[in-house]
């Protein structure tokens, strides 16, 4: 689909503050919130909704209740209406000034069907969310953007952009579920938000106890990068999980299965020399790794980075089960050593991973974005908005739930060199055929 197929008209752009207004306060961010790869980044999502089948809802305007709900929920989440400031020691803090979150209302000249395959993120999606400048300081910028775009068919899209220093993906989903509750007329949140960033004050070690090779800078691939997706259905995933249980007497997650398959298929597709090593990075929610565990409602960053490594020859000659066990062990290692590994000095941290031997996985499939209901039912699809170049995203794999009209499973959204894309899909399909349940 060409970008010009979708035409969006901006109706209004305003700053929405908490209602009633709150006293100004200053809140400290945690050690993880202040990590270089977190404090200077944003993340975003599009939540796509079909028109309501209810006759009374066909002409209803979703922008009005969502805007009103935003003012109400900011009373519970004042940092999203504030601004970032840098302290004398270089850490960031949030001044809860009440300046507001950015809210945009827009109208498309098209029906929702113009977006085509909801699972296939495309350039037109960028019109559905106001893009904040990718500035590492984020001073004087809104920490939250909400854009509601209505379509002529009655469907709509809610685009959201969060500053990563204020929340992680789970925290963002928690906020959106609360926003939806307010939009539906609830007077009280089902889950009270908790700031308490002092609970995540980890020691910054003078010496690293582990070699953080996963952050070493590496050269980029110079080739056209394309974006597509691949779905692993739950029939295949469950069959593999059952096989692991029978052979090893261990449970494995859907993420571990999908990650192992992707790792092997990508390594084969890239034809990496057998003597080299390949690495995958993936985030883990560490809320339960603290002692005591972080409380329900905590919406700050609590993500640690796990790294699984293997020799190419061993990875490709071994079984899928072996790759799954390597990933499982890397998760156990991160959990055991979280407080010594999670925080390192900025000078020791380099997050440029543009190299064919290193890839990053992120799992959005269980965050609950698809369960956000503003009164029109759950989202039929959730998609990120590509605000960075495809070249910058070339080694990034995002795991999501497929759209409601697709088979249940895990959708892998990816950015790969054009010459490798076909080979990758062939390898994935071959593994699915090999491991599919015989019924």
UniProtKB/Swiss-Prot annotation:
The gene is TAT. Pathway: Alkaloid biosynthesis; taxol biosynthesis; 10-deacetyl-2-debenzoylbaccatin III from taxa-4(20),11-dien-5alpha-ol: step 1/3. It catalyses: taxa-4(20),11-dien-5alpha-ol + acetyl-CoA = taxa-4(20),11-dien-5alpha-yl acetate + CoA. The keyword tRNA processing does not apply. Disulfide bonds: none annotated. Its EC number is 2.3.1.162. This is Taxadien-5-alpha-ol O-acetyltransferase. One of its GO terms (molecular function) is taxadien-5-alpha-ol O-acetyltransferase activity. It comes from Taxus cuspidata (Japanese yew). One of its GO terms (biological process) is paclitaxel biosynthetic process. Belongs to the plant acyltransferase family. It comes from the Eukaryota. The active site is at residues 164, 373. It holds the Pfam family Transferase. It is an enzyme of class 2 (transferase). Keywords: Acyltransferase, Taxol biosynthesis, Transferase.
């Amino acid at each position: 689909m060409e970008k010009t197929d979708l035409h969006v008209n901006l109706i209004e752009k305003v700053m929405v503050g908490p209602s009633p207004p709150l006293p100004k306060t200053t809140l400290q961010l945690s050690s993880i919130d202040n990590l270089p790869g977190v404090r200077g980044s944003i993340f975003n999502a599009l939540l796509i909704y079909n028109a309501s089948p209810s006759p009374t809802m066909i002409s209803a305007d979703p922008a009005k209740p969502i805007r009103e709900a935003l003012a109400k929920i900011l009373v519970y989440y004042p940092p999203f209406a504030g601004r970032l400031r840098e302290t004398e020691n270089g850490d960031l803090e949030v001044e809860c000034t009440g300046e507001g979150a950015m809210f945009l209302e827009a109208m498309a000249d098209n029906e929702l069907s113009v977006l085509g395959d909801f699972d296939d993120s495309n350039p037109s999606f960028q019109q559905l969310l106001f893009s904040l400048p990718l500035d590492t300081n984020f001073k004087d910028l809104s920490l939250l953007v909400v854009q509601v775009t209505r379509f002529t068919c009655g469907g709509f899209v809610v685009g959201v952009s969060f500053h990563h220093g204020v929340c992680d993906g789970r925290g963002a989903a928690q906020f959106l579920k609360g926003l939806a509750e307010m939009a539906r007329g609830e007077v009280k949140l089902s889950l009270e938000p908790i700031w308490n960033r002092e609970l995540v004050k980890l020691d910054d070690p003078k010496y690293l106890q582990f070699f953080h090779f996963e952050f070493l800078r590496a050269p980029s691939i110079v080739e056209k990068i394309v974006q597509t997706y691949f779905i692993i259905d739950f029939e295949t995933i469950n069959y593999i999980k059952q096989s692991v249980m029978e052979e090893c007497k261990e449970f494995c997650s859907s993420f571990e299965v999908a990650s192992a398959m992707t790792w092997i298929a990508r390594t084969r597709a890239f034809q990496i020399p057998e003597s080299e090593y390949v690495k995958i990075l993936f985030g883990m929610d560490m809320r339960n790794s603290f002692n005591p565990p972080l409380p329900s409602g905590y919406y700050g960053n609590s993500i640690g980075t796990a790294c699984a490594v293997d020799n190419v020859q061993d990875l490709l000659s071994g079984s899928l089960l072996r790759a799954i066990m390597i990933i499982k062990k890397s998760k156990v290692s991160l959990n055991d050593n979280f407080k010594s590994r999670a925080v390192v000095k900025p000078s020791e941290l380099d997050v440029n991973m543009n190299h064919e031997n290193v890839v990053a996985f992120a799992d959005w499939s269980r965050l609950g974005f698809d369960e956000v209901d503003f009164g029109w039912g759950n989202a039929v699809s959730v998609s990120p908005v590509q605000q960075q170049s495809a070249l910058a995203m070339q080694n990034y794999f995002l795991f999501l739930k497929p759209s409601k009209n697709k088979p249940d499973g895990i959708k892998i959204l990816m950015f790969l060199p054009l010459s490798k894309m076909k080979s990758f899909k062939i390898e994935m399909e071959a593994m699915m055929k090999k491991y599919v349940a015989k019924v």
